[in-house]
Amino acid sequence: LTGQKGESFTNAAMQHGTDTEPLARAAYEALQDVLVDEVGFVPHPSIIMAGASPDGLVGDDGLLEIKCPNTATHIETLLSQSVPGKYNTQMQFQMACTGRQWCDFVSFDNRLPDELQLFVKRVPRDNEFIKQMEDEVVKFLNELDIKIAQLMDLKNV
């Protein structure tokens, strides 16, 4: 609306994740004996103004979501042997945008001994969840369009 570029924010933890992601991708490729195709923004096939940025595409059916958290968070993931729930929506929407059938969640911490650095868990596509989420995204975008139209009307007064 303003035409101005928004401010960006980064901290040491975010920078660590950015710096470490290529190492995590390489470790995953070695473990799974695959090549990961890096992609940028992938628009949703039917919802205009929606899309996702997965960390990579794997084969014909998969994608990759990499997290390089702090050591305590990575250890919790190792101990639970499960994907933190807060990432499910992100991965499901990535599958909706890419048409992929599964997402390998990766947690990686190269500050730990080699055998503890990498955690991989496959998450299958959930079409029922995706449908509900897509309905909510469409609803949100429609509400946003209404608000923008109201602001434009005020601007033209």
Give the residues covered by each predicted segment:
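Accessory terminal regions of nucleic-acid processing enzymes
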Residues: 1-157
